[in-house]
Amino acid sequence: MLLSSRIFLNAQPDTPSSMKNLLLKLCTVALVAMSTAAANVQAADLHVMSSGGFTAAYKLLGPRFASATGNTLDTALGPSMGKSPEAIPNRLERGEPADVVIMVGYALDDLIKEGKIIPGSRVELADSRIGMVVREGAAKPDIGSVEALRQALLHAKSIAYSDSASGVYIERELFKRLGIEDQVKPKAKMIPRIPVASVVANGDYEIGFQQVSELLPIKGATYVGKIPESLQSVTRYAAGIPIGAQHPKEAKALIDYLASPEAQPEVKSTGLDSVTMH
């Protein structure tokens, strides 16, 4: 208002050119003010990288966050580790933009140590356990005990497991712990990039193992259950903000929402277990 008053005091209302200059100045002031206001409320375009285990929960919760905040979410999916181009560490190495990464906790810790994630930005999201599927319509073997799981693996004609943390555990530890590594390895295969349940659903493999949250969404496969707790490998999922994130404030808001008590019903509905401490 002070600027406008000065303009009026210096103007000569009786001169057409003075009035024209006055109007131009007022229009300029208004346009600058409008542009500034628009910039302040402009929604952020958040780039999110998410690995498989938390993806189902993220797909439920992400749109709610976007609707509530006006921000948009540009999402890239990929495993937390491995050699595939889609793996989150490889995406970051190539310089793909990211404001949020959601991945296996220990893989996130590796990125923090490498200086790629902001220290202190890690937030715990959920725990994931390993489960098994068969093709829809097939008999469901008993896997409720250690011995039952052992027999199910021995009698299966073919076994599939993922190329993520759960699959690495199955290949390197579970078979050994059950004492059947030599018998089952020739018929077992790690499945890269695609959901394990999908290759069971189409009949390529008789049984498949992956984190429960990654098994449940796939049509054509029947979820049998979790492997016994004494044999479980619990995978912790966490989120962090990469160094160089364009929207760190909005990224933190998204992460806090995913970890909030309000989000837990959706998190649990996807087969994940809530983390009691954040």
Report each predicted region and the residues it spans.
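N-terminal secretory signal peptides that target proteins for export/translocation
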Residues: M1-L22
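Intrinsic low-complexity/disordered segments
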Residues: L9-P13, A39, A44
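Bacterial N-terminal signal peptides
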Residues: K25-T36
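Exported/periplasmic ABC-transporter solute-binding proteins
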Residues: V41-E86, N90-P97, Y106-E114, P119, ...
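Phosphate-/polyanion-interacting regions in eukaryotic proteins
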Residues: I102
